[in-house]
């Protein structure tokens, strides 16, 4: 794409809001190395830092126009405390990101498989369900994404309604899909085994087997032991974490 766009004097600007952490953690391709001129992303989401934005580029010629567009055109000031928090997040990404993001993806695949085995259709099954932190499920026959997201929230399970293939644009407020993510549960030290339990909670509500009020106490009891944030300088890796780096795996081969 970059070669085609360059023929017409254009540049590719890559929106990596959801993928920024996956890119930094080596779980996703690097757009800048593949021809993108600018990469934008969220410092939250998969990057797990303070809520803010990130703009990255590797062409020195873009430095002046981009920085000028930010200040003074779009922003007059910034929060220094957020910059400090982002600096810590970047340092932790360098130290823990590869292992952290790999576990996020493993957990997402484990959760997808758990839901699939329990009769909830999961998009992307022929390709292993997902290569990111997200799992998309088709819940049209169970009441739709909006209704089920609200029912799950009553049981302290936070999901998001999501458009899926065959939905129409006007279905945005009542789509046929649900979007699930594994960022926070992974940061709390959960692994593939816990995804089985989470899958059970979700299916009990989605299938209509139980009312949310009958599940919420089970969710609270399940969540209670997980009170420590991992993949950070304070607490390091969760117990029994596989911490081999890409170089380690390359050396083993």
Question: How should these model regions be labeled?
Answer:
Residues 90, 101, 105-149, 159-174, ...:
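Conserved small-domain helix->loop->beta segment predominantly found in fold-type I
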Residues 22, 49, 146, 188-189:
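Short helix/loop capping segments that flank catalytic or ligand/cofactor-binding pockets
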Residues 1-121, 139, 182-183:
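Conserved PLP-enzyme active-site core in the AAT-like
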Residues 75, 79, 99, 117-121, ...:
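Intrinsically disordered or highly flexible coil/loop and linker segments, enriched in small
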Residues 106, 171-253:
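PLP-dependent enzyme catalytic core of the Aspartate aminotransferase-like
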Residues 63-68, 83-92, 127-134, 174-182, ...:
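Short acidic (Asp/Glu) and glycine-rich catalytic loops that position anionic groups and cofactors
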Residues 71, 91, 109, 116, ...:
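Hydrophobic alpha-helix feature that most strongly marks membrane-spanning transmembrane helices
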């Amino acid at each position: 794409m970059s070669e085609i766009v360059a023929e017409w004097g254009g540049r590719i600007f890559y929106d990596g809001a959801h993928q920024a952490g996956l890119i930094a953690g080596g779980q996703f391709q690097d757009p800048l190395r593949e021809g993108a001129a600018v990469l934008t992303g969220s410092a939250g989401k998969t990057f797990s830092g303070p809520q803010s934005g990130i703009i990255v580029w590797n062409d020195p010629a873009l430095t002046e126009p981009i920085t000028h567009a930010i200040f003074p055109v779009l922003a007059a000031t910034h929060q220094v405390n957020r910059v400090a928090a982002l600096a810590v997040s970047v340092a932790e990404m360098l130290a823990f990101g590869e292992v952290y993001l790999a576990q996020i993806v493993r957990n997402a695949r484990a959760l997808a498989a758990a839901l699939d085995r329990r009769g909830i259709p999961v998009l992307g099954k022929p390709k292993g369900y997902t290569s990111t932190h997200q799992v998309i499920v088709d819940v049209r026959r169970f009441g739709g994404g909006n209704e089920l997201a609200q029912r799950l929230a009553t049981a302290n399970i936070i999901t998001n309604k999501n458009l899926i293939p065959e939905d129409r644009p006007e279905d945005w407020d009542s789509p046929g899909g649900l979007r699930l993510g594994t960022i926070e549960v992974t940061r709390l030290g959960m692994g593939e085994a816990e995804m089985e339990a989470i899958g059970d909670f979700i299916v009990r509500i989605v299938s209509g087997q139980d009312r949310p009020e009958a599940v919420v106490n089970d969710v609270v009891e399940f969540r209670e032991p997980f009170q420590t944030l991992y993949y950070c300088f304070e607490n390091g890796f969760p117990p029994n974490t596989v911490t081999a780096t890409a170089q380690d795996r390359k050396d083993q081969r």
